[in-house]
A protein has these predicted regions:
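Short, Lys/Arg- and Gly-enriched loop/turn segments at beta-strand edges
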Residues: 44-52
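Amphipathic alpha-helical coiled-coil/heptad-repeat segments
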Residues: 115-157
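Sequence-specific dsDNA recognition surfaces
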Residues: 4-35, 57-58
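Short peripheral tails and domain-boundary helices/loops at the edges of structured domains
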Residues: 56-79
Length: 157
């Protein structure tokens, strides 16, 4: 996975994957629920963008040199990485930029602390339901665009 596979808050996309002839060690292999983070980029606004990994059956999937993996079993993790609190923290931590490659360090990610309110489970259920609906709508939109493209190609032969 590279930074172009990270879609701020959405699941990691699997378009334009790059394959290398190296076997990652066990800790580097992505697991369902892992957060994939852009740790360095020539474009400062892209540093810190994060997606969550959903296992799609790719054996030994891992991240490229400028990306990092955050792993937690807490069900709020993927939502925390989409919060304003996270984004503000990242903005304070970014090094470089202005022509140099901007970056953050693993310690910057580990230094983030969040207050988790009592009763968060209710909000978590709502967020998960909204996301499920959103992903379904995305799939439908993709199919609609495919039908549109097909019809247009047939119309103007």
């Amino acid at each position: 996975m590279r930074s172009n596979n990270i879609s701020n808050g959405d699941p990691v996309n699997f378009e334009e994957l790059v394959w290398v002839n190296k076997t990652p060690n066990h800790e580097q292999i992505l697991r369902s629920g892992d957060i994939v983070i852009c740790m360095a980029n020539g474009s400062s606004p892209l540093v810190g963008k994060a997606s969550y990994y959903v296992d799609c059956g790719i054996e030994s999937a891992t991240v490229g040199a400028f990306c990092g993996i955050y792993r937690s079993d807490h069900p709020l993790t993927k939502w925390l990485f989409q919060s304003k609190h996270y984004k503000k923290h990242i903005q304070r931590c970014i090094q470089g930029g202005n022509g140099a490659i901007a970056n953050i360090y693993p310690e910057d990610i580990l230094a983030i602390s969040f207050n988790i309110p009592c009763g968060y489970e209710r909000v978590l259920n709502i967020l998960n339901s909204l996301e499920e609906k959103y992903l379904l709508e995305q799939k439908l939109l993709s199919r609609y665009l495919g039908v549109k493209s097909y019809l247009l190609s047939r119309l103007f032969i």
